[in-house]
């Protein structure tokens, strides 16, 4: 009996010790995570840095922040969310003027999961909803006075839960719920059938090109088809209106099949924007949004689809490199989005380059046919009125290298409206270009504006664009930008396709009569009055006009990314040919499934290559921790120019350890007591900040209508206002720095982070990101534009080798960032997870050259959130210009040990340079506002850190005690058992 009791105690202590160890591990893990997220925890608790912004709001007379001004602000913020949708919703289709709805058309039925459970935004880092205020399509319809069929709503509420909505599943309800009394209810609510179609993807997950059912995720799934068929077969609905709740350009070639009357693209409207879209439906607002991506009939018809996703390296007998198992190659070159569809269209019309071959066709019944391949062009959008455009004149100022287009817009309808003026150009495609593999898009966006035009009135607007946008990058001949000789055609139109038709009419005249078509296949004539011609003054290709940077004339612009081209690394039998309009049929991309890792490529994939330079300075050559006669505090540097010598004195006060404090981000930057610099919080993201307000009801920060909507407004003022309102959010949340906006290019409609980027076009993103960043700066917020660059997919994002040629890099992918970073509006940039070629972006010297030299960028550089990994070498990153390590406080410690152990003055100089940028940037934020001089920083740890450390000690002690007790009881059990056996042996 005693033995059983003893064993029972041992087992109990075994269970208790196991539980204690588990709890201790959980507590330790929680502590680690909390310390990694220190800035966000401090922000949530109102500790250290909670007062790091010092006013500047426009919602109080003197700029001070208060509960009262917050109430004014939050009302305006939600109104602006609705304005985003009012100006950014795109009317794609409107058969027989089905929209706007009359006041008598108010008895409606909603269909589709998105009507009651829309995709408000992606789930990437960003704002959370405030449920009491969010608006679904049903909410917005009811608020607007519509009588929504309750029987159908009840049917959805009681139906079996649909399949989870994901990147590979639409997650639509089973249409079997529409039976009996449910379908009987249609007659009473038959004015309009509203169908909301939604698609979802997010950070870390691209939309599945083909799902488990073998369908493209951007075509209608079977349940959606059944819904439309049910509506059509019922015969009860006067109109069918689609709300397209998808930032991903869906396939829309089925509208006639299901008798759809109208389609309104609403994108991801954020939590509060949907009422703005419904005002477009009712006609309270005249639609003025235009597409930011091409809607193809088959979403895999773009040449980028041939090389999207993961493609595996073949290492053979070599040991694979860390995070180096996959690659993607942009074999389409510059022919991204509309630049492909429109260029192939022109060449088909003119019989050039075998453009009408079947190669690359996905929706055409015979040879390549524009009207069968494209549903809605880039830049396209309908209105409830009609506009006529005249390009009155075109002026060129050679001193500023600026073209000014004067455009008159006439509203020939009976409704007031906002007209979007889109200015495009066609540049010559010459023999020189063909010989040197310089590609030319048939039409390219140059600039835009938006103006109010009353019914029956005309307005004139000027659009200024840099002449530099007409240059093409020649990576093979001139190894720089070139300006071809010949005629340049400028045109305006409702999207790229109409503008191109206008150019072709002006350029070719009778030769294209009867050949020009719109996206529906209707023959059009083109509007030559919307075209102006400029003849370049050079009679042969000019390779010198743009030889030096327009932002830093001392720097020559020449090839920087030769090693980003897959052909730089590939064996001869694996080299690729980039898509060329000179031969569509023989250069159309095929999938590069694998790439042999030869010795050159293997060495290139190794990121652990840093070696201290032989001529590196010694740490002793630097003055650190200097006690000045008069201490210079953080606030004393307010207003001090970046190149002022005072910075040397200020930074000399800091020790190496103090310099490294700024360089480890923990969702914020810690305080530095030595110079009385407060800590601050840094937050994500492009769709809204993942923080809470410090005033009023302390609700979550605003979840805006997302960046594709901002881009689709085609309105500089609205885009700037988005940045300002985002900045106001930051003021009321005491946040000086945010990781936003996103500016990567939508190379594929399947890109997982589409909701965080503006457009498929680098120029539209150039202007939009510039405007948003400018608006943020107006409010004391440092926007951090991301992810720089070639980060167009989520698959394999950490370490994937991204290959592209330099023309595409410069004209498409870098240009999207150029407006915000080179024009001086943004002082923050985040590099990407991927490799540029084989070199990790944050360790790529080419990126530093572009930013610091060519673009004369004066802000800070941060890597994307990547903890210690062999492909992200801390010293390599630092030497390549990375100033702060995102969500990584271990890297600065690594740097400190390396500097002190190797006496590496080069690394130390980079640490000092990084602090120069970081302190300067923080002072340009709301941290440098009035009141900063009153800040006194304590070096005491926040209370929650002390508490967590105490809990760590307590639970670890309990775990140790439990283990000790288990060991003791186990030993006692064994000893007792031995004694029992001995006694038994003696009895025998």
Q: Predicted segment positions?
A:
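Glycoside hydrolase catalytic-domain context in secreted enzymes
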Residues: 1-472, 482-492, 496, 545-988
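Terminal connector regions
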Residues: 467-542
